[in-house]
Amino acid sequence: TEDTVTQLRNHTDRKIIIRPHPLYRKSSLHSNLREKVLRVADVHWQEADVRKPEFIPIAEQLKKAWCTVTYSSGTGIDAVINGIPNVACDSGSMVYEVSSKEISEVEHPFTGDKSKWANKIAHCQWSIKEFESGECWEHVSKSI
C-alpha cells in the first residue's frame, strides 16, 4: 500500500482514499501503515470498521471516484460494474482484463467495452437450484 500510494502520487494530484481490507484493521501493522500513508499529500484513510460512524459504504464512495486501484479486491468489481475505471495491479484480479495494468495510467485509465467481461462474470453466479441440478458443476468442471 505504501509503495502504491507513492507511485500514485507521482502520477496524479487527485485525492487518494485508502480503503483497507475489513480484516486488515485487526492487524498490528494497520496503525503503522496508516501513519505512513497519511504523510503523503492529500491521502485519506477510510475507516474499515462498519460499526464506526465514519465508515462510508463502497457504493457511496464510488459515486465520487475517478478511478480505483486494486490488487485482487472485490472493490474492483464494484467499480467496474458501476462504470468507474480500475487499475488492476495483480493478474489474479477478476477485473484484470477490463482494467488498466499500470499505476502510471491512472489519469487515462481503460474505459473500453466491458460487455464480454460482464457476460463472463454473470456466468460465475449460480442459484441453489443450479447447484442441486448439477448444472453448476457441469460448467465449472470443464475448467479443472
Language model features by range: what are they?
Residues 1-8, 30-36:
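Well-ordered, non-membrane alpha-helical segments in soluble/globular domains
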Residues 14-16, 43, 86-87, 115-124:
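Hydrophobic anchor at the start of a short beta-strand
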